[in-house]
């Protein structure tokens, strides 16, 4: 039977509960335990797939096709495990399941209520998810006191009775703010947040205090006194130069040891963090840097392309260079000098997205990178716009476009997938999850991967139109990767260009700090060569 670590948050959102959960997972896994992590989001959406990236950040897609909160990306990167649909729980998913069961008569005419039906459904999912784990870490989204989160908090309170108090740890992430006027840290918000938790019957074992200034022992003792925890259970976490430093900070303060003791697990020895030491050391002490232009539709929201940026950092660590990301709003390029906006960059990356806004700016950036020999990497929509740009400006297909942006295009080089034609619902209906792809020998893609059979994650409705494949290939574009069994073009590249590759998939979702994605690693290698005056490969 699994033991459980529940991570809640108080005072304000965005304190780093996901990073805390991932860091705890890292420390426990490095001690040899089987660990998994679940995110429980209190919103009524069934999943994150239809949510606005400006509000919610990126959608993280799992191998099994679940569209989830970006925190699952943190979890996968920190514990280096492949997660799935069962690792993402939302209010919408729970209520949909319970209402469906009620309609089928599963409750035998009983009155269906939040307690016990909703809370039991939540608990049953946690128990199932923990069946093959030593420790299941569960992050509850939002903050204590939010009305939406009450059923989840009640469910995790009841879990202590269900599995035994000795098998449960409650870790509360809270804020200790610095008041500039008073020139001091304030503990009252943390006290009130813990009081709110205690009001519903949850007594936290550990407090993770986010603060911008050092906390002295007197302050930790004060928090411990008013919140009824040992002073050593008051953990200070300040902003780090890289999120991959957080496990070291938590370990130095004994967080992993306290969790193991509370759960009755062996806590002798030290976690093997040698690979993480190498990552952080190479990140912090990189002697050189490259600059990559990220030309996207949602760059104003720092989390909209979170996995892309992390994958670039991973590739930089692999090569021992810092990667500086220049965020370029594609819509602004439509009325700006593209050359001036991209001046001095060592590579251009065009990420995914949806809709017509900013598309011509993307196409302008693609043309500039192609003509100037700048390493160019397109992901999903980025790959599609690379095809559009090449069709227009090299193959003389005037008006070539994607049916998504121009349904009446004379040359729809990107078109709606056949199986999408009769779909009238938006959520969960795209081509989602991992699919196999065969690579052509002797291509850039094959060299990057080092194998001819790969699997990557997808999230799209539109695809390369094979009616134009012969003409585009005759014009010099090369198809180097095709989905096995259905002839769907997955990768295009341009022989003779320093580095030019577009993939229909989202390789960034599988990148790890200790194991960068092959395409990102080779892309940054090409950027380094350009920086130092060499060719891209």
Predicted regions and their residues:
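Flexible phosphate-sensing "switch/lid" loops adjacent to ATP/NTP-binding sites
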Residues: 1-324, 330-347, 354-355, 362-368, ...
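Active-site proximal loops enriched in glycine and acidic residues that flank catalytic Cys/His/Asp
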Residues: 9, 39, 211, 238, ...
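Cysteine-nucleophile active-site neighborhood
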Residues: 15-18, 22-26, 30, 341-436, ...
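Short beta-alpha connecting loops at secondary-structure transitions
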Residues: 55-63, 240-244, 350, 371-377, ...
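Glycine-rich, charge-decorated loop segments at or immediately adjacent to ligand/cofactor-binding or catalytic sites
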Residues: 179-186, 384-393, 494
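Acidic/polar loop patches that form or flank catalytic/metal-binding clefts of enzymes
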Residues: 206, 268-271, 377-378, 388, ...
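C-terminal and late-domain segments of enzyme folds
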Residues: 432, 440-537
